[in-house]
């Protein structure tokens, strides 16, 4: 990864031993290795995310081509891309649609009289406080 040879590694180790000492050197090595591991994980995560986004972009381009050509005379590759894109769109929309539907049903099920009763209770308690 860094293209470091054996003698360069030995030189870095000796300098680290002189600068940090034998007590702090193992802790410093562990810290550096954790940092490098975290950097590698972050780089892999970004790489995976970019490849996913590029795949989505490619699917969208194939869908545009399919719309322009007409749905009748598509190549098998484009047909599979269109189907895959439709499935992805349905899977994305489904959780939001289910949530919106359940919220709508909950809102319809709650009676409005509860709000009116609470307002009346507040008015009565305010009137009682004024009377005292």
From Swiss-Prot:
User: Which InterPro entries does this chain map to?
Assistant: TatA/B/E (IPR003369), TatB (IPR018448)
Q: Which Gene3D superfamilies match?
A: 1.20.5.3310
The portions of this protein that span the membrane are 1-21
**Is the Zinc keyword given for this protein?**
no
A single GO CC term for this protein reads:
TAT protein transport complex
Presence of keyword Transport: yes
- What's a Gene Ontology MF term here? protein transmembrane transporter activity
UniProt KW keywords: Cell inner membrane, Cell membrane, Membrane, Protein transport, Translocation, Transmembrane, Transmembrane helix, Transport
Membrane topology term reads: Single-pass membrane protein
Q: What is its main location?
A: membrane
How does the record describe its quaternary structure?
A: The Tat system comprises two distinct complexes: a TatABC complex, containing multiple copies of TatA, TatB and TatC subunits, and a separate TatA complex, containing only TatA subunits. Substrates initially bind to the TatABC complex, which probably triggers association of the separate TatA complex to form the active translocon.
Under PANTHER family, the record lists: SEC-INDEPENDENT PROTEIN TRANSLOCASE PROTEIN TATA, CHLOROPLASTIC (PTHR33162:SF1)
Task: Give the family this protein belongs to, as stated in its UniProt record.
Answer: Belongs to the TatB family.
Protein name as catalogued: Sec-independent protein translocase protein TatB
Q: What organism is this sequence from?
A: Vibrio parahaemolyticus serotype O3:K6 (strain RIMD 2210633)
């Amino acid at each position: 990864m860094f293209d470091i040879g054996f003698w360069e590694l030995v030189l870095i180790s000796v300098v680290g031993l002189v600068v940090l000492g034998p007590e702090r050197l193992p802790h410093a090595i562990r810290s550096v290795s954790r940092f490098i591991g975290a950097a590698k994980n972050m780089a892999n995560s970004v790489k995976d995310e970019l490849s996913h986004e590029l795949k989505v972009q490619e699917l969208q381009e194939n869908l545009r081509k399919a719309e322009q050509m007409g749905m009748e005379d598509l190549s098998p590759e484009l047909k599979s891309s269109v189907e895959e894109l439709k499935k992805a769109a349905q899977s994305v929309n489904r959780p939001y649609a289910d949530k919106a539907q359940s919220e709508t049903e909950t809102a319809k099920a709650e009676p409005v009289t509860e709000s009116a009763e609470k307002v009346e209770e507040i008015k009565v308690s305010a009137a009682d406080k004024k009377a005292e």
